[in-house]
From Swiss-Prot:
Listed name of the protein: DnaJ homolog l(2)tid, mitochondrial
Keyword Calcium included in the entry's annotation: no
Function field: May act as a tumor suppressor in larval imaginal disks.
Modification N6-acetyllysine, positions: K121
GO CC list: cytosol; mitochondrial outer membrane
Chain ranges of the J domain: 80-145
PROSITE patterns to which the protein is assigned, alphabetical: DNAJ_1 (PS00636), DNAJ_2 (PS50076), ZF_CR (PS51188)
Amino acid sequence: MISCKNLCVLRQLPLKNCRRHYSAIQSSAALLSVRPTKWTPKPAAAGGAVSAWQQRTTAKQHQQQQRRSLFSSSRMQAKDYYATLGVAKNANAKDIKKAYYELAKKYHPDTNKDDPDASKKFQDVSEAYEVLSDDQKRREYDTYGQTTENMNRQGAGGAGGFGGGPFGPDGFSQNWQFRSTIDPEELFRKIFGEGNFRSNSFDDFADSKFGFGQAQELVMDLTFAQAARGVNKDVNVNVVDQCPKCAGSKCEPGTKPGRCQYCNGTGFETISTGPFVMRSTCRYCQGTRQYIKYPCAECEGKGQTVQRRKVTVPVPAGIENGQTVRMQVGSKELFVTFRVERSDYFRRDGADVHTDAPISLAQAVLGGTVRVQGVYEDQWLNIEPGTSSHRKIALRGKGLKRVNAHGHGDHYVHIKIEVPKKLSQEQRALLEAYAELEEDTPGQIHGMAQRKDGSKKATAGASETKTDAQPAGRTADSGSQGTSRAGAETESAKGQQSEKSETRRKDQQTGGESGSGGGFLNKIKSMFN
């Protein structure tokens, strides 16, 4: 026989009140390799008193059984917030917010009145976003399957001897039920506005306290003149800055933080879950070793709040469309991207600008000056005689200011000759006279006949067209008036034909002393005499 005492020593079993005996036939090796699945002390005799050790042993076994069952059911019933939002566990904050943005619109009760489960789905999506959008809550959820706020609700006691552990006051695991601190409807209104889905609601949501809590980017609209000359513009942005009430101390004014009572000021805690022991950063002080008994009511003990501020953004002169500048706002950085409107007059090419300058036919032939609008001031442009259309004239240094370099760009002016569409009788007569004197005309001119000697003369119907360049399809009355006028002009042209020939012969004989212009002036004088 193996004594009960030796058997208990080998198996590390308690000796007190042990009355069990084992047969020597059983192999000692088998006894050492197979431990009884359940050991219970021999009950006391009827009417006998139960010892304190027996009571503690029975209670401990009961607690272990309850702990296994409840802890397993808690894990099985825990919600997978990543699956709720349809994102991966390594998804960044932008992907999480985008997923919530789409699902919130999809499952909102106002847009799914026929779906009885829409309200429940909308609540689940809001719960998942509230936890995963907060870095601290997400870290705690990934580690423990719940957050500190919910663990605090479970009461003191539990693993490691610290309150708020994964087990309740009796050492039993409790199933975590989410308790949102933000109304899902309020969160939805912050995103989409009141009563409608705005096109820019997602941008507003990013600047709200339910988004990232920080105005990281801002798009500013500018006119061309504002971008060219520079301007200071005031904008309202949401920034995360030091709490004005507690000045960043996280405590109510007049109070101070004390040593963390959960980690004893070490910043770490030890959590025991069955046979496993884990040492990690304290969940209550986050490694700061301090415990805030009276947290600030304004910032809820975070030391920072989302504040609406009016910020003056200095727009540099010459800024281009799509450029981004960085500026400091409190303790954070604000990135401002500029969106410059197109100008109806200026065409921009970097620091250079291009404009069109219309000039008359006389200015193009004889030369002159024209006033053009510049970027910063008007400029007088000199037109040389014989300037052709689409000629490009450069005004050096009159363009836009270079943002990242010294100096200015150039202003290029493109000449546009405006041909008159309506001519008076005198203007048409002058042009016909000039056409007769023109010698290098490519092709033919309407209303001009070619002589044998190479000269040109106006035909009978050359001047019959009205000064407003009326088309050929006229009414009967206008046609009759044009016919009578054409007959009169034909007789006048015949009477002047001999005079034209004589004038041309005199010009040729004089060797061009007065130039072709002399014959041209005589022609004009004869037409108006």
